[in-house]
Amino acid sequence: MTDLSDIRREYTKGGLRRADLPQNPMQLFELWMTQARDAELSDPTAMCVATVDEHGQPYQRIVLLKRFDDSGFVFFTNLGSRKAQQIAANNKVSLHFPWHPIERQVSILGEAQPLSTAEVLKYFMTRPKDSQIAAWVSQQSSKLSARQVLEGKFFEMKAKFAKGDVPLPSFWGGYLVKPSSIEFWQGGEHRLHDRFLYTRQADEWVIDRLAP
């Protein structure tokens, strides 16, 4: 077994105090996202999306956040993917933003709701053309005999859609994750980290400090 117990560091970038918290967690998330971008973090919009299959087995993968507002968090994916199939059976999901360089994490629990075709199309048309074509190529989570199969199909579809717009695939969509709770974690000295949990109750958010 490889021993990693000596890998550690102190957290020194500041604390989080209840007096500084807005009543709406989305305001704090927007501030932290802005600060993550200003700090030039690599992929600040990258989040871990966790789902569960019919046997209770959890799965995780990194997906890019594409939009957020008071209603929730939006991401897009292939509707034939493992994550989409699991969401169809159980739409309770967890999102996690690991902003290690600025000693912060955000963890979100909620339910994923499918976006309308109009909402999906609006985003799809903003993607680079090669990314639009790639959406047609990949049968996400299916087995491939070789990478050449994927590349061959990409160039085939690229020739097919050489002229004009790339249409939206019927098997490509998106989700709005409506949060039921949002936890903000700020690293603290001596491992005395600051954790605040916002829990949705009716039309209000209840705030609790959690032990580190």
Curated annotation (Swiss-Prot):
Pathway: Cofactor metabolism; pyridoxal 5'-phosphate salvage; pyridoxal 5'-phosphate from pyridoxamine 5'-phosphate: step 1/1; Cofactor metabolism; pyridoxal 5'-phosphate salvage; pyridoxal 5'-phosphate from pyridoxine 5'-phosphate: step 1/1. Keywords: Flavoprotein, FMN, Oxidoreductase, Pyridoxine biosynthesis. It comes from the Bacteria. Its cofactor is FMN. It is an enzyme of class 1 (oxidoreductase). GO terms for molecular function: FMN binding; pyridoxamine phosphate oxidase activity. Transmembrane segments: none annotated. Catalyzes the oxidation of either pyridoxine 5'-phosphate (PNP) or pyridoxamine 5'-phosphate (PMP) into pyridoxal 5'-phosphate (PLP). Homodimer. This is Pyridoxine/pyridoxamine 5'-phosphate oxidase. The lineage of its organism: Bacteria, Pseudomonadati, Pseudomonadota, Gammaproteobacteria, Alteromonadales.
